[in-house]
UniProtKB/Swiss-Prot annotation:
Keywords: Cell wall, Disulfide bond, FAD, Flavoprotein, Glycoprotein, Nucleotide-binding, Oxidoreductase, Secreted, Signal
Function, in words: Probable flavin-dependent oxidoreductase.
Glycosylated residues (UniProt): N52, N257, N292, N341, N441
Cross-link (6-(S-cysteinyl)-8alpha-(pros-histidyl)-FAD (His-Cys)): H110-C172
Residues covered by the FAD-binding PCMH-type domain: 73-247
Disulfide partners: C32-C95
Family: Belongs to the oxygen-dependent FAD-linked oxidoreductase family.
Designated name of the protein: Berberine bridge enzyme-like 4
Organism: Arabidopsis thaliana (Mouse-ear cress)
Pfam families: BBE, FAD_binding_4
Signal peptide: 1-19
Effects seen without this gene: No effect on the levels of ICN metabolites.
Length: 530
């Protein structure tokens, strides 16, 4: 391990020195940072350089969640600025822009393609994890949350003052609020309350000129864009003001497995017909996954059904028996618990795990993984499901699964143009494809197998365009080089992520960042659309 780290540090040092030679303004950038920050809030301690390789490597890896992008040949990283004060963010934006250095903004590091912490041109990471304050006002049912705070921290802070308030966001506790909220993050409350951006009522953002703006000073067009269009194309999100939502003191959850031998395909087919029509207080996720069979060395598909009901077991059983008896849900399958404890259930923590784990911030990279997404408008026929199972079983020794996340409820009633997030009425469910592997040598074969699974699903999902979820970043749906933005290419991936909202997003980008400073391989281009 020590040898690997030494080599990694050496390559980092070489790459940074090479970048510094090719970017003589890097020294001016550092000088600019010091000039633009005050002695009361010095920025020096927030900067990690390659000449301090232990700190530099630790800073990079701590918020690198996909191991595919933790190897040195992927990056030309000059420095990491882990901002500790708003002035650090402002200075980093102004100084990077004035010195021609690309900026990548990282909140929690969960960008699936690493675009928040990678580039093929010399760049600086602006890390937001130190800006993590959360203020909850119970009387108004509102909260301010900084971009570097995690969902686990938000849920815990809310629960500390009220056990009957929550926020409709995701189930991964370590996800950062900055990117998750701006991309339209969702969770098991979406059928009842919608998604994150539907509950944002104010925001603070640093614009391309280093100015601190809120909803009143940024204008409604920019405020619309950062709610679902991804904040990283328009500026640096500092914080969000959100409306909290009501939940009962006790919710009910269940987890039921159905193998193919137990009729898993038939049960899942019926799920497609009923999941989006359940009462909006009920969310049932279906998760087909590769599992060990009954015989040694045999692999099969098990469909796992996870559910949350905003009520008690008896009421849930009545709904299930009437609408979906095929699942065979039993009273003993159900567990009643607080909403906060239900977040542990959804994250697959063992029973009895203390809720304090929601505050943990793992400091090592995750596994190698690849994810993709789809939206489904009509039920996938059983023969289509069987083709998907056959393809999933081709994966080598990977962990591989799909998540079917139901729509319906309030999602059908919010207009596609209400925010920049467009995927609303007309969807039965959203699919997430996911595979994990544990050896870098398996990367190419794993990516190829994921591509095959995605191709097999094509006849059964949305088309023209084939829609995709922005927060499940997927470079395969289209991309630009790190230092360029081709509008035609941007329209390819942009139309999949944002559908008819892309034109308005491009107009907003042209107004607020006409020189395209805030860019990455899948950013919004600054083009006025007539």
């Amino acid at each position: 391990m020590k040898g690997t780290l030494s080599v990694l540090c050496l390559v980092l040092l070489v790459s940074v020195l090479e970048a510094a030679v090719t970017k003589p303004k890097f020294g001016d950038f550092i000088g600019c940072l010091r000039y633009r920050t005050s002695p009361e809030n010095p920025i020096t301690d927030a900067i990690s350089f390659a000449d301090n390789t232990t700190t530099f490597l630790s800073s990079y890896v701590s918020y690198t969640k996909n191991k595919r992008f933790s190897t040195p040949n992927y990056r030309k990283l000059l420095a990491i600025v882990a901002a500790k004060h708003v002035s650090h963010v402002q200075a980093t934006v102004v100084c990077a822009k004035s010195n021609g250095i690309q900026l990548r903004i990282r909140s929690g590091g969960h960008d699936y393609e690493g675009l928040s912490y990678m580039s093929s041109v010399p760049f600086v990471i602006l890390d937001m994890y130190n800006l993590r304050s959360i203020t909850v006002d119970v009387s108004s049912k509102k909260a301010w949350i900084q971009a570097g705070a995690t969902l686990g921290e938000l849920y815990t802070n809310v629960n500390d003052v009220s056990q009957t308030l929550a926020f409709p966001a995701g189930v991964c506790a370590t996800v950062g609020a900055g990117g998750h909220i701006s991309g339209g993050g969702y969770g098991n409350l979406m059928r009842k309350y919608g998604i994150t951006v539907d509950h944002v009522i104010d925001a603070q953002i640093i614009d391309v000129n280093g100015k601190l703006l809120n909803r009143a000073t940024m204008g409604e067009d920019l405020f619309w864009a950062i709610r679902g269009g991804g904040g990283g194309s328009f500026g640096v999100i500092l914080s969000w003001k959100i409306n909290l939502v009501d939940v009962p003191k006790i919710v009910t959850v269940f987890k039921v497995n159905k193998t193919l031998e137990q009729g898993g395909t038939d049960v899942l087919y019926k799920w497609q017909l009923v999941a989006s029509k359940f009462p909006e207080s009920l969310f049932v996720r279906a998760m087909p996954q590769v599992a060990n069979g009954t015989k040694r060395g045999e692999r099969t598909i098990t469909v796992v059904f996870y559910a949350q009901f905003l009520g008690r077991t008896d009421a849930l059983m009545a709904i299930m028996n009437q609408n979906w008896p095929e699942l065979g849900l039993k009273h003993e399958d159900c567990q009643e618990m607080s909403w906060l404890n239900s977040t542990l259930f959804w994250a697959d923590y063992p029973a009895g795990t203390p809720t304090s784990i929601l505050l943990d911030r793992p400091s090592s990279p995750g596994d190698f993984f690849k994810s993709k997404s789809d939206y489904v408008k009509k039920p996938i026929p059983k023969e289509g499901l069987e083709k998907l199972w056959k393809t999933m079983l081709k994966f080598n020794n990977n962990i591989v699964w799909m998540q079917f996340n139901p729509y319906g409820g309030v999602m059908d009633r919010i207009p596609a143009t209400a925010t920049a997030f467009p995927h609303r009425k007309g969807n039965l469910f959203k699919i997430q494809y996911f595979t994990t592997w544990f050896n870098a040598n398996a990367t190419m074969s794993s990516l190829s197998q994921m591509k095959e699974l995605y191709e097999v699903a094509e006849p059964y999902v949305s088309s023209n365009p084939r829609e995709a979820f922005f927060n499940y970043r997927d470079i395969d749906v289209g991309s630009n080089p790190s230092g360029e933005t081709n509008v035609d290419e941007a329209k390819i991936y942009g139309s999949k992520y944002f559908l008819g909202n892309l034109k308005r997003l491009m107009d907003v980008k042209a107004k607020y960042d006409p020189d395209n400073f805030f860019k990455n391989e899948q950013s919004i281009p600054p083009v006025r659309v007539m």
